[in-house]
A protein has these predicted regions:
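P-loop NTPase nucleotide-binding/switch module
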Residues: 97-140, 145-152, 169-229, 244-247, ...
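Short, surface-exposed secondary-structure boundary micro-motifs
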Residues: 20, 34, 72-73, 91, ...
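N-terminal accessory targeting/assembly segments
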Residues: 1-103
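Short beta-alpha junctions and helix-cap segments that line functional grooves
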Residues: 27, 39-41, 54, 70-73, ...
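C-terminal amphipathic alpha-helical interaction region
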Residues: 539-584
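Short histidine-centered loop motifs in beta-beta connectors
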Residues: 54, 59, 119-128, 159-167
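Short, compositionally biased
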Residues: 43-49, 80-91, 142-166, 184-199
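P-loop NTPase catalytic core
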Residues: 221-222, 228-552, 564
Length: 584
């Protein structure tokens, strides 16, 4: 019999219940109020008193209201039909809800039960299968999706029967499995999985090493991220976090893109909803939305659902990874998720940590980032989740707890800087503070040596050193004035400016410059390094400035020209002539 409870206290969206039976941590219950049933999650159990966080507004909720427990945790429903959907944090289909505002206590089923899918069997009667083994395949938006053995099963099973190739709905039984005791288990296309629990349906999780091409030079060339890697983008407001995230999600080499807009401003989420259906996928020429799922929880939605939305997005990503797909997960912004954790922690009167965040914030963040990664599946295939989260530190302070704790677990750090944004140097990633720890991985070095060449990492480190030297000289020029430093110093400074303008800066709104393939990035890097190695002869700093401005202008024109086009080759020739003019 289901456990029941009555409300004994309400503090905003945290409700205390007195229960008459056993209750599990993270179990879901429904509280009845004025004809609505409000969904809530157990966050703390003390004897017969249970603390729950309600995923809706608790306005009008009275002491004495009744609650009924479901006996399961917060689960997502997984199956064909999720691509190109817009969900909220609890996986309600937003397109099925009408009205300007979401009504309280309104929940919708995330999948389409009527739609028919063309099922192709991948196993035959008598085969032995284990949890998450591939049983069949359906095509959704030209993406082959696998129908798998339910994840929660353990041990091995025998395929007793499988339907022939044909059209079925998600609720039709497509396979019947038999366990060791001879019990039949019918399997359809739907899976359920609790969001707070990581899926471990793979053989091993090696260190990731394959470069994930994004087309953004400051990432691919200077601080690369890998398939199955983790990265985060902190930065104050207006520095271009969202534009950079959109650029990555449009251009990255991923099969599935999942965007979790948790706690973002409503107008930014509307921007995603209106922009993404219009975008064309550069890899396939089809609409980008066909392989995208958006999970939206704006700032004005209840705090608890904001926390759930990040976990929902990660669980959906793990489901696609189990099919052997490359998934890109973007969370915008993890700070709002951490604030939701802080709010609940404060309401439960727990001991506060730094900035009143919970004491275990670092464990929560590292457990979450740990769910991403590159895996070898049980059948020998590989899948990956590349996770990039943005952090919006209050006042742009990168020393606050969320940024500090994320720094410990994320391998790539792209620090967006207000000063660069103010100077209109976009993307405003500070090349000196940012880093990618993947450059130190021997596996990555081997991969890059095969993919591009063995000197690549040495060249990347050289441009970082030159940028640092250029910054030091810029400070000296500021203090001593242009005449106060030798002409050679001006040359070093302008060579670092050349790297900044040609490699780091990129126009996200230009058709050509917004996406730079690796082949072109290699040519740009070699060209800039060759110029930096060239000795030039100048008499005054004004000559240096005028000469390098011409050079930067030619290089920028090359970036805007189609690769290997007549125009591109013409600018390249002009650049070579300009370099020859002053070289010693």
């Amino acid at each position: 019999m289901a456990t029941k409870g009555t409300v004994s206290g309400v503090i905003a969206n945290m409700v205390t219940l007195v229960v008459d039976g056993p209750v599990a941590q993270n179990e879901i219950c429904y509280i009845s109020t004025g004809g609505d049933k409000l969904m809530a999650e157990v966050i703390k159990v003390v004897g017969s008193h249970v603390y729950v966080q309600v995923f809706e507004s608790t306005r009008g909720l009275k002491v004495g209201a009744e609650a009924e427990f479901t006996g399961h945790m917060l689960e997502v429903t997984l199956g064909p039909g999720m691509l190109s959907k817009n969900y909220d944090g609890l996986q309600n289909d937003l397109d099925k809800m009408d009205g300007v505002f979401l009504k309280r206590g309104q929940y919708t089923y995330p999948l389409d039960k009527e739609r028919v899918w063309h099922f192709v069997p991948l196993v035959k009667v008598g085969d032995e299968v284990g949890p998450s083994a591939w049983l069949g395949q359906v095509d959704e938006n030209f993406q082959p999706l696998k129908i798998m053995v339910p994840f929660q099963l353990t041990g091995t099973y025998e395929v007793k029967s499988i339907v022939p190739e044909g059209d079925y709905t998600i609720e039709d039984t497509v396979v019947v499995l038999t366990d060791r005791e001879g019990k039949d288990i019918p399997v359809n296309m739907i899976q359920k999985w609790p969001v707070k629990k990581a899926m471990t349906n793979y053989k091993e999780k090696p260190r990731p090493y394959k470069l994930l091409e994004t087309g953004v030079r400051v990432i691919d060339t200077v601080n690369p991220i890998v398939e199955g890697g983790t990265g985060f983008i902190p930065g104050p407001f207006g520095t271009g976090k969202t534009v950079l995230q959109h650029a990555i999600s449009k251009q990255a080499e991923a099969d599935i893109v999942i965007i979790a807009a948790c706690g973002e401003r409503a107008n930014e989420v509307v921007e995603i909803f209106t922009e993404f259906p219009e975008l064309v996928d550069p890899h396939t020429g089809r609409k980008l939305m066909e392989r995208t799922i958006i999970i939206a929880n704006t700032s004005n939605m209840p705090v608890a659902a904001r926390e759930a939305s990040v976990y929902t997005a990660m669980t959906i990503s793990e489901y696609y990874r189990a099919m052997g797909l490359k998934v890109l997960l973007m969370a915008d912004s993890t700070s709002r998720w951490a604030q939701a954790l802080r709010e609940m922690s404060n309401r439960m009167e727990e001991l506060p940590g730094p900035d009143a965040f919970p004491m275990d914030i670092s464990a929560i963040i590292s457990n979450f980032y740990g769910r991403a990664g590159y895996v070898h599946l049980n059948n020998g295939e590989t899948g990956s989740i590349t996770f990039i989260g943005t952090v919006s530190p209050a006042g742009g302070n990168l020393k606050e707890p969320v940024t500090e704790n994320t720094k410990k677990v994320a391998r790539c750090f792209y620090a967006l800087e207000q000063e660069r944004a103010d100077r209109k140097r976009y993307p405003a990633v500070n090349p000196i503070d940012s880093y990618s720890k993947y450059l130190e991985y021997p596996e990555f070095e081997e991969y890059i040596a095969k993919r591009i060449n063995g000197e690549w990492i040495g060249k990347v480190n050289e441009i970082k050193t030159r940028l640092l030297r250029g910054k030091e000289i810029a400070e000296q020029i500021n203090i001593l004035g242009d005449d106060g430093v030798p002409v050679e110093y001006h040359v070093i400074f302008w060579k670092s400016e050349l790297i900044d303008f040609v490699i780091l800066q990129q126009d996200a709104f230009d058709e050509v410059d917004s996406v730079t393939p690796m082949e072109r990035q290699e040519e740009i890097l070699n060209m800039v390094i060759d110029i930096c190695h060239t000795e030039f002869k100048f008499d005054t700093f004004i000559e240096v400035m005028d000469y390098f401005k011409k050079m930067i202008n030619l290089c920028k024109q090359m970036n805007y020209a189609k690769y290997k086009s007549e125009q591109y080759e013409d600018f390249k020739k002009q650049l070579q002539e300009l370099v020859a003019e002053r070289s010693v």
